[in-house]
Amino acid sequence: MKNQSVDAVDHLDRAVLAIGTDYADGQLLSWHHHRRAQLLYGVTGVMQVSAGAGAWVVPSGQAVWIPAGMAHQVRMLGVSTRSLYIEPASAPRPAAQCEVLAVSALLRELLLQAVEMPPEYDEQGRDGALVTLLLHEVARAPSLPLHIPLPRDDAALLALCERFLAAPRIDARPQAWARSLHVSERTLQRRFRQAIGLSFAQWRQRACLAQALAALAQGVPVTTVALDLGYDSPGAFSTMVRRVLGRPPSALAARQPVAGHNAPACL
């Protein structure tokens, strides 16, 4: 199925529904939720996902797992997707929060094949076997560190985090944050760990990586992205991206715009 709202087929007696969708660049899917769990795979572009526990950035070629019933919104930056909508009883991942997943070559091909299946596919035939293998591959997909958690119970720290996300820089120093909160640097680091589960440096890097992926998807040159984020050199920036994602920034740069039309507002 392609460019079809899941609401139109959600009633079908199938454990997994696969839908391919092309989105206009910059299209925002405002807050919504699905009865089924969702695996949202980006063939092209970058997806920016927001949910209760923070934000996730999903580079091209990777996917985000969204548990059943979780309210979320997604901004699409040059994105064509392949989604699986999975009955909660068949969900292959136990996560209670969103996760960005690394998509193997096998999982990618299975996703591309799945959207070619008819909605009421033969569960006892080839399509049923494909779905079974899909669920196994989703279950074993490794999680990537592309979640930007936000504090829930520390309003002052949350305000600083949100301000930083508007203009992240890798050269931001914890001493300045500590002064803003009128605490010692040691206390700041402890509050970060308690409220977010990451060190200041780890969270800062994730925020910068999220900004970088969005900028690269919009065609900003690698050198400009690196310098805007405060890296000493494009090489230092490229090293960080390779270490986290296993790919150079050039592999994440904007591709040809996706042909198509505006997709349904909630998918």
Show which residues each predicted segment covers.
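Short hydrophobic/aromatic patch on the recognition helix
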Residues: G61, L188, F192, A236-F237, ...
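A short, Lys/Arg-enriched amphipathic alpha-helix from helix-turn-helix/homeodomain DNA-binding modules
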Residues: R126, V131, L144-P174, A178-L181, ...
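Ligand-binding loop in jelly-roll beta-barrel domains
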Residues: G69-C98
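Terminal helix-turn-helix DNA-binding modules in bacterial transcription factors
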Residues: Q175, Q194-P234, S238, A254-L267
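Generic protein-terminus/edge-of-domain signal
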Residues: M1-V46, A265-C266
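Short acidic-glycine-tyrosine-enriched beta hairpin
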Residues: A53-A68
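Amphipathic alpha-helical segments enriched in hydrophobic/aromatic residues interleaved with Lys/Arg
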Residues: A91-E162
